[in-house]
Amino acid sequence: MASGFCSLALTVTTSLFSSHAITRRVLPILRWRSSSMSLSPLRHSRALSAATTVPISSSFTWDDVIETGRAEYNSSDLTGFFEKINRCNRGSEKLGEFIPFVIEEQIVGYIHKRFTEYLREFHDIFTFSQNGSCPDRVDGYVTLNLMLQKPEDRTRAVADVIKILGDKGIIPGIRNELYPVKPSFNAPVFFSLERAAAPYFGIKGYGVHMNGYVERDGQKLLWIGKRSLSKSTYPGMLDHLVAGGLPHGISCGGNLVKECEEEAGISRAIADRAIAVGAVSYLDIDQYCFKRDVLFCYDLELPEDFVPKNQDGEVESFKLIPVAQVASVIKKTSFFKANCSLVIIDFLFRHGFIRPESSGYLDLYQRLRNRDCS
């Protein structure tokens, strides 16, 4: 196509998420030499230090949460909310360290240039194209071998690579859960990728987050969960009543019902009352990881006598807390898992806890969706 890679160069540097097709090139089919994956100790150590994110843990208690929330909520001061949004949108100055990951002429992700060193070893799976017409702007792109035409073939081939990289500790925390790889939510799925590998390939990730609330004596209260200390990610931190990533092959509504049962013991009859209220999005770059997430937000008003009961062992306990107190905790602490704060801030807008009279109101609202929400 005429737009090709030269026009893409401007896209990568100034407007990362514009949809530009990339001219298809005939790429050589080379043999995959898996034995060449043996890395020198120095190189392997350096890769791990750059690629592994240390899980966040917290030793605070519910008493700490309640004590923090007791301070009077000041709806006019939005500073703490901006800080939480910034926490989920780090690393924009590092965009130049990544190159596009392309399938069928569509950008589906972004891969760190140094991480591509591992992928170059798998010659039958990944191919690399340089942009000869404007090399000063773009350092080429990564794609899959043209022999891999079917989604299921791509899924199997890439899964073999991820297993090797996972066994070597280069991609930690393998979950055996597949995420769809596609340029946008309603686009066709090009293949499926192990969830733990998603940020290393910079693919779009989707999730469902539900605000479970109760109205009592004219006051709104939110059910908040505290993650189990055995969780591999964000152990012991505060979380939504129900939240989860969106795997391949299940709808948002279907996944929400499943998560409601597993995480809080909410029956389908009650879960079906949840209302889809929008989405938030963010982009977080941390070393080799490039997270482009869209979270679909739901509200569910629960009966006053409802008490959640975790079924899958991933939640330590729950607490019903007035919304104004939850807002204060988000403002003043880092007790919440970072992306949960965004969904609750959106809830605060919709339920009148953040008002137009507050300085920065529109800026804050816009920044909840200031990345590619598609």
Curated annotation (Swiss-Prot):
An example Gene Ontology CC term for this record: chloroplast
Cellular localisation: Plastid, Chloroplast
CC cofactor: Mg(2+); Mn(2+)
CDD domains reported in the protein's UniProt record: NUDIX_Tnr3_like (cd03676)
Top enzyme category: hydrolase
Residues the record lists as binding Mg(2+): 259, 263
Entry comment describing in which tissues the protein is expressed: Expressed in leaves and inflorescences.
Residue intervals of the Nudix hydrolase domain: 205-346
Segments carrying motif Nudix box: 244-265
GO MF entries: hydrolase activity; metal ion binding
Keyword Acetylation set for record: no
Family per record: Belongs to the Nudix hydrolase family.
Protein name: Nudix hydrolase 20, chloroplastic
Organism, as annotated: Arabidopsis thaliana (Mouse-ear cress)
Gene that encodes it: NUDT20
